[in-house]
């Protein structure tokens, strides 16, 4: 599978940003982001109440202003991106790029996300919205005094996707395992132990019961089995983008650090890294990275010798259960 090329077009969106008392941007929610051509300059600006009413609507204006309980202020913003091929300019810009991914307006790797970790604050994501960590204890006490539920769901730089975007045709059994910036194609089902990071996801109907790490692409009609792991690009200095082709099956508790072409199977419990020594049908032994991206192969471990073998495949492993993907 070819990694989607970075796109040159830009984007424009209006949204609501949550600011800490010191002005730190905790999040920005863009309900209707759009790709745009001819944007002259990248940047973000705070909107007046009148402009917010024009571009967002009265219901959004009513949410603006200070929230004393969390110690934050909610403002309306307009964010413009001249080209998604250039790095993000500010935190609003980062959130817009993550929204574009989860709205399926761009595919993973089509927007430049270099350096975004340094632009995102570590935030307490609560049932009442984002909260600065230095306000968390006071916010909890104020919530108790007001007799309202205040549940801390996560402490992280990335929020849950479904707090901002719920793509059509998708089922997610455990929403805290899908980060904003995940790209889930229509027909995707993410089961309870499935996980999808930002700038990663599915390009067609898929079953996700394992982990799709950052940067990973899974193509149509593929199944990431329970507990299966696909190595990403965030840790360990990895640069290679791992992809899974069409109609592939990763067995339960298997894993890959190489790309799979179409119609491939990795046996349950078998973990294939780039350096794994693999026995070929002719008896020769090669490193698995030499087979990266090949179509129609089965990786399995010999139950007697323990050696990893690769076998050509001419038959389908089956297919996804269509009833599980009518979302």
Question: How should each PLM-predicted stretch be described?
Answer:
Residues 1-167, 292-327:
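Terminal amphipathic alpha-helical/low-complexity segments used for targeting or macromolecular assembly
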Residues 163-164, 176, 252, 284-286:
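A generic local structural motif
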Residues 170, 176-178, 182-184, 188-190, ...:
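A structural motif detector for beta-strand N-caps
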Residues 240-245, 289-293:
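Glycine-rich, flexible loop segments associated with nucleotide phosphate handling
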Residues 261-263, 278-279, 313-314:
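Composition- and surface-driven signal marking solvent-exposed, interaction-prone regions
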Residues 275-290:
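A conserved acidic, glycine/proline-rich C-terminal tail/linker
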């Amino acid at each position: 599978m070819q990694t989607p090329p970075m796109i040159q077009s830009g984007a424009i969106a209006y949204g609501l940003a949550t600011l800490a008392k010191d002005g730190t941007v905790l999040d920005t929610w863009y309900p209707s982001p759009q790709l745009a051509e001819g944007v002259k300059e990248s940047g973000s600006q705070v909107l007046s109440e009148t402009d917010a009413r024009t571009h967002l609507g009265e219901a959004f204006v009513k949410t603006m202003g200070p929230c004393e309980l969390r110690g934050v202020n909610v403002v309306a913003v307009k964010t413009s991106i001249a080209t998604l091929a250039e790095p993000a300019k500010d935190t609003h810009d980062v959130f817009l790029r993550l929204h574009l991914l989860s709205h399926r307006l761009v595919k993973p790797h089509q927007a430049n996300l270099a350096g975004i970790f340094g632009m995102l604050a570590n935030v307490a994501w609560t049932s009442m919205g984002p909260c600065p960590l230095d306000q968390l204890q006071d916010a909890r006490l104020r919530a108790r005094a007001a007799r309202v539920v205040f549940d801390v769901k996560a402490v992280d730089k990335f929020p849950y996707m479904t707090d901002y975007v719920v793509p059509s045709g998708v089922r997610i059994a455990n929403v805290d395992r899908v980060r904003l910036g995940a790209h889930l194609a229509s027909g995707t089902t993410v089961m309870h132990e499935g996980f999808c990071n930002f700038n990663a996801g599915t390009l067609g109907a898929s079953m996700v019961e394992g982990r799709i790490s950052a940067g990973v692409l899974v193509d149509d009609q593929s199944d990431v089995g329970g507990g299966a792991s696909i190595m990403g690009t965030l840790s360990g200095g990895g640069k290679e983008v791992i992809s899974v082709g069409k109609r592939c099956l990763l067995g339960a508790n298997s894993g890959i650090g190489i790309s799979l072409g179409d119609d491939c199977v990795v046996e349950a419990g078998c973990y294939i890294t780039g350096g794994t020594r693999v026995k070929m049908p002719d008896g020769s032994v090669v490193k698995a990275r030499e087979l990266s991206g090949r179509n129609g192969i089965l990786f399995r471990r010999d139950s007697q010798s323990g050696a990893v073998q690769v076998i050509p495949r001419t038959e389908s492993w089956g297919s996804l259960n269509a009833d599980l993907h009518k979302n």
